[in-house]
Each structure stands twice: as C-alpha cells, then as structure tokens.
Amino acid sequence: PDVSSRYDAVMLANLSPDHPEDRHIMFRRLRVWVLHHARTQEVSLVCLRNFERAADGSCIWNYHVPTGNGLSTDISLKIEMVAGKNQTRVSFLRRDTHGHEYLEPENPVKLIVRPDVEDRNFHYSTKANGLESVWPGKVNFRERGFDFTPAPGRTLTLTASSGRFVPAAEWNYMLWQPNEAARGLDPYSDVYSPG
C-alpha cells in the first residue's frame, strides 16, 4: 500500500482503553521487494493487479511482480485488524500460477520486508530534526522482529512468523503526501525504518 496522506498508515491505534481519542501512528508504511536469483523487484503500484476487501473486513492487494528473464510471480498482501486490540496482522501469499510467463511454483522467491515507523498523532507530521540520534536507541532487536518504544507506555512490536530480522537503520526524508499538498498543508513527512 502506498502513502498519499498523513492519515495513511498500516496501523493507526487508539491508545486509550477507556474511550475513543485521536489515532496515533507508529506503523506507517511497509515496503516490500521480491528477491529471485539476486534480482530484486519492488512490490509497488506499478505491479498492482487489483485490490479487494474480503468478507472478513481484511484488505488484499494482488500484485503481478516481474522476477527476471521475462517471468513473473503473483503475490498477495493481506492486512487485517484484530478485533478489540491495537493489533494488525499482515500476511503474504505467493499465488500458485502456471503459464509460460510465470516463474514455476517450485522456484523459490524471498521477500524483503521493510517497515517504516513514526511516533505521532495522526494530525501531525514527523520531522527527523534530531530524532536520528534518538530513535535508533529506542529499538530492541529480536531474531524475527523488533520492539520500538519511543516513549514510556508506547511500544510497537513487529514480529515475523518466519525469516529473520536484519537491523539496517534508514531514514526516508520528505516522504511526499499529495493529499496534503492539494490542501495547501505541509506535504512532507519523515519516516524511520529499523531494518
């Protein structure tokens, strides 16, 4: 999923268990690449075939991703909220596709998944302005994920069911948000990825 507005995020949480309040963004964006034979291809809007909302309320993005040598593979990304919790489940599925233009199912591909995080009220934007030296120290790495605790009482926990987490801190500055630009608001935000 792409980001067009400051209100777009993988997860916007209501941090109060007692009453509704402004949403808080900590898990902003998810960037994904397909890796096959040392060739990476970003899973982006260019590859998007369609989008659907499933009967259970989850959202599914279906991608047709080039893998090299004129071949492709189909990947589905599903995002669902867990009822009653500030929890989002993200899952990937490689579709079983056949045909001369598809990579054979027995040829493995890997996914590189890079989450971008923030710590803000959903009405604001993140500006790095010194956070580059603070946020890396707020991340606790684990074999399959990390905990990001930017302030007491707020922790984002990301855990993968398989694979491994590779620490590789990166800031993306001036992430363009066209909806804010159209409204005459500051169209830029900064995001941090622990790895």
Segments and roles (model prediction):
Residues P1-G195:
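Terminal accessory carbohydrate-recognition/targeting modules of carbohydrate-active enzymes
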